[in-house]
């Protein structure tokens, strides 16, 4: 019973089969991102991969990180890559001969990453039941209270307390507002520069 409650807390009440389907879809999209010969199509698969990962993170309760994936990776980085690739004239024939050479390296990197994660990440949730033997311990009480407090302090449901999102926003738009404007100008110059380069080549 305790194991079921723990698993339900991990997946935020959603069906674990849906999470498995999202994980499988993300793996397929990641493979197509590497294998695709067209860079524009590869970026589109990358956007789909980030979208699936963000949905997965939101469903397990990590809403801030999931929305950060949507805003940063999809809304800024991937769209900027797609914008630049559509402006630059890339010959597909130049990529066909060298694209397949990266597949063994990608497979080796994926196997290495899975091995490292398998050694470091705890896969057996029964090990957490060791806390049941310390029913009268002060450590168990404080540990449970800290877990419940961190789970209840969700930035999208509790708008009264100052959360990480509001703290970052207050610091970014008050103390570091000048640097935020500088970064925005640099991004604007990068976009205008890519347009000028592409127009110069056409002329």
From Swiss-Prot:
Location of this chain's protein in the cell: Mitochondrion membrane
Transmembrane region(s): 16-36, 40-60, 70-90, 102-122, 179-199
Domain of life of the native organism: Eukaryota
Pfam families: Oxidored_q3
GO cellular component, one term: mitochondrial membrane
Reactions accelerated catalytically: a ubiquinone + NADH + 5 H(+)(in) = a ubiquinol + NAD(+) + 4 H(+)(out)
Sorted UniProt keywords: Electron transport, Membrane, Mitochondrion, NAD, Respiratory chain, Translocase, Transmembrane, Transmembrane helix, Transport, Ubiquinone
Main location: mitochondrion
Molecular function via GO: NADH dehydrogenase (ubiquinone) activity
Bilayer topology term: Multi-pass membrane protein
UniProt entry tagged with the keyword Transmembrane helix: yes
EC numbers on record: 7.1.1.2
Family named by the database record: Belongs to the complex I subunit 6 family.
Task performed by this protein: Core subunit of the mitochondrial membrane respiratory chain NADH dehydrogenase (Complex I) that is believed to belong to the minimal assembly required for catalysis. Complex I functions in the transfer of electrons from NADH to the respiratory chain. The immediate electron acceptor for the enzyme is believed to be ubiquinone.
Protein name, entry field: NADH-ubiquinone oxidoreductase chain 6
Originating species: Trichophyton rubrum (Athlete's foot fungus)
């Amino acid at each position: 019973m305790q194991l079921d409650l723990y698993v339900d807390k991990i997946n935020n009440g959603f069906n674990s089969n849906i999470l498995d389907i999202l994980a499988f879809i993300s793996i397929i999209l990641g493979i197509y991102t590497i294998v695709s010969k067209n860079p524009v199509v590869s970026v589109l698969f990358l956007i789909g991969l980030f979208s699936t990962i963000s949905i997965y993170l939101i469903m397990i309760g990590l809403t801030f990180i999931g929305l950060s994936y949507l805003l940063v990776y999809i809304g800024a980085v991937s769209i900027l890559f797609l914008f630049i690739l559509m402006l630059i004239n890339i010959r597909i024939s130049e990529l066909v001969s060298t694209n397949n050479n990266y597949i063994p390296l990608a497979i080796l990197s994926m196997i290495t990453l899975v091995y490292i994660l398998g050694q470091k990440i705890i896969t057996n949730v029964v090990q957490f039941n060791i806390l049941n033997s310390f029913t009268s311990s002060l450590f168990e009480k404080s540990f449970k209270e800290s877990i419940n407090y961190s789970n209840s302090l969700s930035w999208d449901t509790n708008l009264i307390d100052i959360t990480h999102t509001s703290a970052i926003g207050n610091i970014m738009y008050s103390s570091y507002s000048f640097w935020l404007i500088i970064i925005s100008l640099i991004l604007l110059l990068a976009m205008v520069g890519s347009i000028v380069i592409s127009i110069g080549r056409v002329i």
